[in-house]
């Protein structure tokens, strides 16, 4: 899909409440596609016996992967949990590791979990009306800790690419789970 003239100026609609765009290409991720990414795979299987919930979707414009352009779009991460672990995006490094990304939270609340190849981790809150800068060299994953969809606008260098494979093997070193006191970041048991 490439409906836009990327060597010219154009405008595109994005609904600021729900992140949808009539002109963007939508990709949906269901629990069945992500069940191995949650630490409690038994809880995931139990949910899948009843339904296959939509965990998140993103809307992008099909920007060519070339230097100098900016890819942008929206992510809608729905509320929910697998066991005690909150719904999350798959997360990724960029193929060009030295690429940063910016997320602007349009609605909802959550957390961005980040880690670099050396194992350093950080977590930052995602709050409506705030922009979050994800530094270069950091894999990043959004987590919805609220009761409503977490809606974010994102942008990054179009030639950066996505590396999902590195994360798919063991997941992130840290995960976000519900405790009596609220959302808590813990070590991922899969890294033990």
In which residue ranges do the predicted regions lie?
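Trp-centered recognition loops
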Residues: 128
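N-terminal capping/interface segment
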Residues: 1-15
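Active-site region of the double-stranded beta-helix
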Residues: 20-125, 145-150, 155-192
